[in-house]
């Protein structure tokens, strides 16, 4: 039977700087933030109710995964390229991204529909049920990667990956894990369909 000291030693070694598990645990909140996108689930449900459900649904899902993946890869590549002092630039990037998210939240709050009025659905949602696979893929890419919230969260995760001290292969493997977790809310419904 393993002693408590041995268990604590294993846990602390997994949390050391440069550890894959430590980096995964640092990127997990970012991935959950991206995955918790109700807009993606709503769009996918609307697409799956259409006449081209399978092809457009797969295209949307692929577009989402590629959108998150491209942004993450670009951020990681940038982070690895400027890795002279990763701690300094990642702190500034995280501060900037946090401030941008705060500004976006305040802006969204001010633009909310007043109580008692019926909200109108966004224009991009009209016609989703009969969208072509190409349109669905582009929409998935834009919602997954270019959506301001997801863009900032994914760049935050990429900054964490770039400053992690892991080897290049470990960074890319951890990045793939991030993309999978960030895409789980579109992968699971599509897989069930």
Task: State what each model feature region is.
Residues 52-126:
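Membrane helix-loop-helix hairpins that form the core translocation module of multi-pass transporters
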Residues 3-16, 104-148:
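Alpha-helical multi-pass membrane helix bundles of inner-membrane/thylakoid proteins
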Residues 9-85:
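Juxtamembrane transmembrane-helix termini in multi-pass membrane transport proteins
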Residues 16, 78-88, 160-170:
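Membrane-interface helix termini and inter-helical loops of multi-pass transporters
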Residues 111, 192-193:
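Structural signal for alpha-helical transmembrane segments and their membrane-water exit/capping regions
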Residues 21-56, 122-191:
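Structural signal for alpha-helical transmembrane segments and their flanking helix-loop junctions
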């Amino acid at each position: 039977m393993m002693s408590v000291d041995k268990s604590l030693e294993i846990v602390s070694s997994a949390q050391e700087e440069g550890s894959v598990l430590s980096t995964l645990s640092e990127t997990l909140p970012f991935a959950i933030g991206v995955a918790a996108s109700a807009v993606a689930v709503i769009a996918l449900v609307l697409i799956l109710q259409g006449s081209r459900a399978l092809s457009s649904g797969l295209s949307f899902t692929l577009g989402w995964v590629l959108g998150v993946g491209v942004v993450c890869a670009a951020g990681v590549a940038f982070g690895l390229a400027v890795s002279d002092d990763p701690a300094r630039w990642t702190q500034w990037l995280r501060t900037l991204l946090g401030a941008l998210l705060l500004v976006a939240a305040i802006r969204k709050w001010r633009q909310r529909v007043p109580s008692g009025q019926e909200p109108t659905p966004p224009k991009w949602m009209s016609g989703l049920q009969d969208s072509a696979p190409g349109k669905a893929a582009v929409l998935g890419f834009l919602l997954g990667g270019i959506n301001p919230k997801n863009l900032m969260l994914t760049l935050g995760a990429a900054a964490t990956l770039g400053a992690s001290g892991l080897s290049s292969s470990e960074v890319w493997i951890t990045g793939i894990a991030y993309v999978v977790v960030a895409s789980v809310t579109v992968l699971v419904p599509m897989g069930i369909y």
